[in-house]
Swiss-Prot record:
The glycine cleavage system is composed of four proteins: P, T, L and H. The glycine cleavage system catalyzes the degradation of glycine. HAMAP family: GcvT (MF_00259). One of its GO terms (biological process) is glycine decarboxylation via glycine cleavage system. InterPro entries: GCS_T (IPR006223), GCS_T_bac (IPR022903), GCST_C (IPR013977), GCV_T_N (IPR006222), GcvT/YgfZ/DmdA (IPR028896), GcvT/YgfZ_C (IPR029043), TrmE/GcvT_dom1 (IPR027266). The keyword Transferase applies. Belongs to the GcvT family. GO terms for molecular function: aminomethyltransferase activity; transaminase activity. This is Aminomethyltransferase. It catalyses: N(6)-[(R)-S(8)-aminomethyldihydrolipoyl]-L-lysyl-[protein] + (6S)-5,6,7,8-tetrahydrofolate = N(6)-[(R)-dihydrolipoyl]-L-lysyl-[protein] + (6R)-5,10-methylene-5,6,7,8-tetrahydrofolate + NH4(+). Keywords: Aminotransferase, Transferase.
């Protein structure tokens, strides 16, 4: 039976179309995905992301554990409480189990935020490894998570919390601070400024209501996906999976190769691929015509066929955009097979849109 977040009643009350997502009943939209998308690009939107998994790790061995488990290096957070780090969690073959964010907290513990779709893989792995290493680990299912995104996100938080939000509003991207009992990270998945607010689950409905009263537009999974695609952000299970490495998913920048003696899980496989070169790479495409290039569509190239990993109509650009996995040696003559016809495409470097501006 699908699970419900603490904000389920708010979604139903607002007329959301609710769908099953990774075992959770989540809002797809509240009437207009387009209006929700545009609200985030031009004003402020609100997302329930309480289905994501929050796991807290603490104790003398927590740092060493995460340095072994993650491809990026939490040593980068040393002495920087409130700082966040984006990383992949890999399998032994170098494949991406999940992408996640880890925060160093004020008390020298760590907070890991991972995806809902991988909850049953990531959390048990962290808890099991923590237990073996004598690290205190806590699955924080007592928490909810609300993302406030858009150019007016900061002003809405200031309006609601005043001076109490000063530290959070002073944060740069990938930093976090407290707003009372709220853990506020200046992070998001939309390509706009914003905050992800982690708070006690029983306080989430009241905060959601206050945010909507302040003018934030409730947004569903549909807008979340079109916004992240415009921002050129990967989605687990699409741009990356356990058979795809960070080097094949445009995430090589998240792998900390130094120091060379840090033996994180998947390192040997990645080093082998790094020496010989990845067979695939992830690119952005602007596709001619009006028909969207959907996930799974074939991409013809001068070096063999690739595949669309995510594709949709871009509300901001007014035409189809896509992310695609193509042979590493492909250089041009991009064509996408749409309904048995080939549509010409132009390779671009994502993001397509960032902070409301077209980048391609």
């Amino acid at each position: 039976m699908p699970q419900r977040t603490p904000l389920y009643d708010q979604h139903v009350g607002a007329g959301a179309r609710v769908v099953d997502f990774a075992g959770w009943e989540m809002p797809l939209h509240y009437g207009s995905q387009l209006a929700e998308h545009q609200a985030v690009r031009s004003d402020v939107g609100l997302f329930d992301v309480s289905h994501m998994a929050v796991t807290d790790l603490s104790g003398p061995g927590a740092r060493a554990l995460l340095r072994e488990q993650l491809a990026n290096d939490v040593a980068k957070l040393d002495g920087r409480p409130g700082q966040a780090l984006y990383s992949c969690l890999l399998n032994g073959r170098g494949g991406v189990v999940d992408d996640l964010i880890v925060y160093l907290r004020e008390d020298a513990s760590y907070r890991v935020v991972s995806n809902a779709a991988t909850r049953e893989k990531v959390r048990p792995r962290l808890l099991e490894q923590a237990h073996a290493a004598g690290v205190t680990a806590e699955a924080r299912d007592d928490l909810a998570m609300i993302a406030v995104q858009g150019p007016r996100a900061a002003s809405v938080l200031e309006q609601l919390f005043g001076d109490q939000a000063a530290a959070a509003l002073a944060c740069k991207p990938f930093q976090a601070a407290a707003i009372g009992e709220i853990f506020a990270g200046r992070t998001g998945y939309t390509g706009e400024d914003g905050f992800e607010l982690i708070l006690p689950a029983d306080q989430a409905p009241a905060l959601w209501d206050r945010l909507t009263e302040a003018g934030a537009q409730p947004c569903g999974l549909g807008a979340r996906d079109s916004l992240r695609l415009e921002a050129g952000l990967n989605l687990n299970g699409h741009e990356m999976d356990e058979e795809t490495t960070p080097l094949e998913a445009a995430l090589g920048w998240t792998v900390a190769w130094d120091p060379e003696d840090r033996d994180f899980i998947g390192r040997a496989a990645l080093e082998e691929q790094r020496r010989h070169g990845a067979a695939w790479r992830l690119i952005g495409l602007l596709v001619e015509g009006r028909a969207p290039a959907r996930e799974g569509y074939v991409v013809r190239t001068d070096a063999g066929d690739g595949v669309i990993t995510s594709g949709a109509h871009s509300p901001t650009l007014g035409g189809p955009i896509a992310l695609a996995r193509v042979p590493a040696g492909a250089e041009g003559d991009w064509r996408v097979v749409i309904r048995k016809r080939e549509a010409a495409a132009r390779r671009v470097k994502p993001p397509f849109v960032r902070h409301g501006k077209v980048c391609v």
